[in-house]
């Protein structure tokens, strides 16, 4: 049974058939490049111009208050900037999870991505948005691919394409999001969650 303040999509992610806005890219166990190792990327845009996403599980030590103090109140814990990727690290991008039943249409500064996820214009007034969103996450930089580049990496098995839950974006500071996403998948994919973090332990 779903509580009044919850939405069915909070618990059951729809099956991901292909890359699109609102899907996750999960780094495969063989992807050892430090920037993306065990990363979980939320796809914000995927179109003829390429693909843009943000890494959900790379918190920085920089407090949101020190960079964008007006957004600190709405920022989800741990209220730090997250490293969205290697592209334009001096630029900020913001995602928010809408409250159940909230409609982003007509709310200045919100652009719908998928489900209850929206992009937020950081020039908007946080006080105006507060009633519509559960929380925001602000990313320094993003991850980007040109046309065909991501498809090649997926064919090479660098990435696993999966569906997202709203809670993935606002995940807590100590959570192993990579493992959490895998554990909710059917067998045999869920077994990858047992893959050791430190390969030297294996």
UniProtKB/Swiss-Prot annotation:
PANTHER family: UNCHARACTERIZED PROTEIN YQGE, UPF0301 PROTEIN YQGE
InterPro entries named among the record's database cross-references: AlgH-like
Organism encoding this protein: Mycobacterium tuberculosis (strain ATCC 25618 / H37Rv)
Annotated protein name in UniProt: UPF0301 protein Rv0038
Pfam family, one: DUF179
A GO CC term assigned to this protein in UniProt: plasma membrane
SUPFAM superfamilies cross-referenced by the UniProt entry: VC0467-like
Family in the record: Belongs to the UPF0301 (AlgH) family.
Superkingdom per UniProt: Bacteria
Gene3D superfamilies for this protein: VC0467-like
